[in-house]
């Protein structure tokens, strides 16, 4: 009866009422991936790069940056207990403690620079002392303090650029220096001897309490000792190896140090005898950044997944494993997505999600499936470039062509995009194929007027200051699965949408979506809210958009499309995703948070490609959104 009445009214009113009914009847769920916990108060902290474990099993980790919490996170029994400090207070590379205090490498500060250690009262969580350690006070983007250890009333500090380990009282009074080239992680054995990891040399060196050189552990070629822990009950030194073995090596210290065992799969996540190459999980470690044990004999291993540049708040991710005394996995705490996004995977109909570096699946935090970076086979992978101006390639876009995945990885507000393919021999590892700008596309111009890869694998790019869209047709795959593209067609950008800032092309419906930037603005990444939809673009319609969508909400930042819907995220305003009909231009619904008791959805989307969308074969739309506050990915599942 209601439908008949709607049909009876004037056409204009009819459209409005139908839109209203559609808005009211849409349903969606709100979920998250890439963090063990969904709320800001409980979320696992971003980018933990070192850890210290108290005897009672309280775990402290240090991070360079956590957007919405203190940089030292506190955990116990798989739960979040709180944080210490502010979001950027710490460097992240070193932490230790004793019964009363924590000692943490401080981040670069405009007042005192780099190279200091802060002492924090474990009862109050407040800093009560700063110890200036290094004369290298101008290093903003690298670790100056690379190791910390305490023994009795002494504090040992690795001054990396000073090529020394400095010894202080725990009250900050200098005692002596021990000369060591490039010192890193530290540990003290039962006799008070100091063990110093020299990561790049593959050496762990022993010094007496007075600083005299003693034994040396020369590890195998390629080994990289990144973390140390002395296991007193067993008299063993545990060494976290970030070289190709990616495991923990155990040394007995009676007499000449001798390796007596390992913990973790040899080859870590790249091993193919116990899993798929790239697959993470129980004892399939990535970078072993921290090791600790509690009085009950539980072992804690902090992993950092591979990928990231000079921004140490985005290089690696928190992947903390707890193992019982028998070596059985007890729990994991993970924070894997900061200023990043994972796209639903067409090959698995949206079951898997690929970010620039990782693969996820599941619900309610999900499962960390794989790290797609192989630093040993592909050391020049752009996702490992410490000089990358984008601070990492964490944002993923995906295309499926004939069953072949193409991954495009980029930064937060990118001018260049990196391409990867997959094959069965490499498992989950993404194989680098080049970039735009770069050789595969025969251009050195940055992409400043929009980028898209469509379902045919074609690339559409608005190259800097050309006022054209370059359309690179995909020409196929070679025998290894590597894609290639042909010479571009140059298409004049419609004047009504200049300056252009976003491009989406839907190959199945021949629909082009163009979003306008802000004329005269210094911020070429910004959108002004004017979006033109061209149906039949390849068929010749490059001048008559219909519909034209002028957004009413301020500061749109990221758009994605699937089916006949457009999804819009905003910056500095609301966390919502608005959904528009690409046929009518009408606002259909707004996705907010239907799961407030279990999760937060962040503040906004402050990245150009921080929203992805996919239409599943079931008719369900899967929309992902970056939540940098919670170091997670928001996942909407929408049923129109």
Give the ranges of each region predicted by the language model.
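Conserved beta-propeller blade signature
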Residues: 58-60, 102-104, 155-157, 193-196, ...
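Short loop/turn segments that connect beta-strands within beta-propeller blades
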Residues: 75-79, 121-125, 168-173, 207-212, ...
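Beta-strand-rich domains and repeat architectures in extracellular enzymes and scaffolds
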Residues: 39-68
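Short glycine/acidic-enriched loop and turn motifs that connect beta-strands
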Residues: 65-69, 108-113, 162-163, 201-202, ...
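Blade-level signature of beta-propeller repeat domains, shared across WD40, Kelch, NHL, RCC1
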Residues: 341, 359-361, 602-640
């Amino acid at each position: 009866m209601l439908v008949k009445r709607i049909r009876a009214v004037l056409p204009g009113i009819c459209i409005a009422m139908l839109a209203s009914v559609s808005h009211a009847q849409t349903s969606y769920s709100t979920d998250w991936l890439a963090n063990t916990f969904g709320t800001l108060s409980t979320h696992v902290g971003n980018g933990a790069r070192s850890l210290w474990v108290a005897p009672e099993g309280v775990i402290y980790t240090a991070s360079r940056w956590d957007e919405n919490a203190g940089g030292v996170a506190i955990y116990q029994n798989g739960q979040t207990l709180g944080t210490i400090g502010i979001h950027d207070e710490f460097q992240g590379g070193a932490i230790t403690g004793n019964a009363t205090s924590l000692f943490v490498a401080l981040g670069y500060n405009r007042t005192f620079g780099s190279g200091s250690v802060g002492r924090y009262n474990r009862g109050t969580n407040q800093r009560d002392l700063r110890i200036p350690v290094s004369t290298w006070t101008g290093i903003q983007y690298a670790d100056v303090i690379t190791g910390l250890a305490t023994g009795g009333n002494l504090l040992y500090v690795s001054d990396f650029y000073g090529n020394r380990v400095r010894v202080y009282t725990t009250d900050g009074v200098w005692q002596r220096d021990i000369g060591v080239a490039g010192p890193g992680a530290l540990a003290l054995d039962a006799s008070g001897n100091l063990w110093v990891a020299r990561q790049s040399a593959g050496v762990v060196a022993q010094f007496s309490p007075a600083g005299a050189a003693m034994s040396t552990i020369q590890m195998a070629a390629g080994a990289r000792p990144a973390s140390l822990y002395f296991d007193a009950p067993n008299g063993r030194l545990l060494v976290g190896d970030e070289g190709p073995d990616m495991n923990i090596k155990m040394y007995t210290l009676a007499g000449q140090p001798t390796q007596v065992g390992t913990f973790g799969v040899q080859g870590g996540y790249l091993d193919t005898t116990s899993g798929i190459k790239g697959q993470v999980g129980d004892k399939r470690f990535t970078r072993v950044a921290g090791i600790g044990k509690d009085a009950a004999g539980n072992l804690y291993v902090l992993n950092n997944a591979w990928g990231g540049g000079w921004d140490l708040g985005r290089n690696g991710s928190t992947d903390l494993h707890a193992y019982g005394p028998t070596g059985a996995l007890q729990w994991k705490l993970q924070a894997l997505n900061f200023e990043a996004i994972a796209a639903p995977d067409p090959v698995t109909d949206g079951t898997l999600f690929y970010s620039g570096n990782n693969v996820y699946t599941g619900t309610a935090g999900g499962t960390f499936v794989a790290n797609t970076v192989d630093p040993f086979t592909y050391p020049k992978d752009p996702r490992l470039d410490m000089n990358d101006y984008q601070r990492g390639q964490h944002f993923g876009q995906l295309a499926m062509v004939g069953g072949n995945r193409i991954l495009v990885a980029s930064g937060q507000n990118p001018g260049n995009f990196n391409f990867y393919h997959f094959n069965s021999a490499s498992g989950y590892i993404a194989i680098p194929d080049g970039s735009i700008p770069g050789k595969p596309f025969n251009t050195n111009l940055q992409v400043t007027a929009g980028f898209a890869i469509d379902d045919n694998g074609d690339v559409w790019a608005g190259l800097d200051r050309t006022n054209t869209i370059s359309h690179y047709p995909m020409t196929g795959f070679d025998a290894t699965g590597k894609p290639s593209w042909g010479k571009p067609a140059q298409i004049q950008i419609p004047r009504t949408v200049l300056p252009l800032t976003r491009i989406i092309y839907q190959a199945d419906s021949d629909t082009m979506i163009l979003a306008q930037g802000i004329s005269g603005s210094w911020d070429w990444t910004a959108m002004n809210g004017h979006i033109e939809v061209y149906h039949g673009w390849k068929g010749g319609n490059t001048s008559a958009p219909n519909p034209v969508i002028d957004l009413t909400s301020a500061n749109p930042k990221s758009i994605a499309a699937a089916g006949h819907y457009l999804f819009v995220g905003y910056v500095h305003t609301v966390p919502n995703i608005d959904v528009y009909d690409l046929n009518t231009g009408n606002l259909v619904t707004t996705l907010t948070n239907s799961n407030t008791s279990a999760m937060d959805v962040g503040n906004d989307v402050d990245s150009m490609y921080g929203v992805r969308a996919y239409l599943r074969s079931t008719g369900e739309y899967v929309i992902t959104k970056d939540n940098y506050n919670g170091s997670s990915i928001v996942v909407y599942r929408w049923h129109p």
